[in-house]
Amino acid sequence: MPRRRSIEPRKILPDPKFGSELLAKFINVLMVDGKKSIAESIVYNALDTLAQRTNKDALVAFEEALENVRPTVEVKSRRVGGSTYQVPVEVRPARRNALGMRWIVEAARKRGDKSMALRLANELSDASENKGSAVKKREDVHRMAEANKAFAHYRW
């Protein structure tokens, strides 16, 4: 940790189509080997499909899906007197977004549909309806935190 002042996180440019910083971050999470234009086309195709399916604005549907995947608590390992406890801690807002995006992308990559755009659209569609692998991941994390609530006093 720096002794003098905290480092401000870098500002990322909003995405060109919707002007959303959240969507630009999501594109960066999806991007592989620096191929941003490919990641953008995948995300935009997925959002078009999602908008047609849900009859909502693409950005609204995306934010709704992300909201359903964001975790509020997680567990962190804490070593106390020779034994390791899983201590539930609240998740910072920036990490909340990052985890939600990462889980959506991981779940989409594991799906068996034809194109990545279709997989992503299906995962976002499922997430907006509170089902799918990404939502299940969030529920698992919340369940772990709930099960280890007794160790909450070990927070640091």
Swiss-Prot record:
Pfam families: Ribosomal_S7
Range of residues in the leader sequence: none
Cellular compartments per GO CC: small ribosomal subunit
PROSITE patterns for this protein: RIBOSOMAL_S7
Alphabetical list of SUPFAM superfamilies matching this protein: Ribosomal protein S7
Domain of life per record: Bacteria
A GO biological process held by the record: translation
Key word Ribosomal protein present: yes
Keywords: Ribonucleoprotein, Ribosomal protein, RNA-binding, rRNA-binding, tRNA-binding
Gene Ontology molecular-function annotations: rRNA binding; structural constituent of ribosome; tRNA binding
PANTHER family registered for this protein in UniProt: RIBOSOMAL PROTEIN S7
HAMAP family for the chain: Ribosomal_uS7_B (MF_00480_B)
Similarity comment: family membership: Belongs to the universal ribosomal protein uS7 family.
Job of this protein: One of the primary rRNA binding proteins, it binds directly to 16S rRNA where it nucleates assembly of the head domain of the 30S subunit. Is located at the subunit interface close to the decoding center, probably blocks exit of the E-site tRNA.
Subunit text: Part of the 30S ribosomal subunit. Contacts proteins S9 and S11.
Name the UniProt record assigns to this protein: Small ribosomal subunit protein uS7
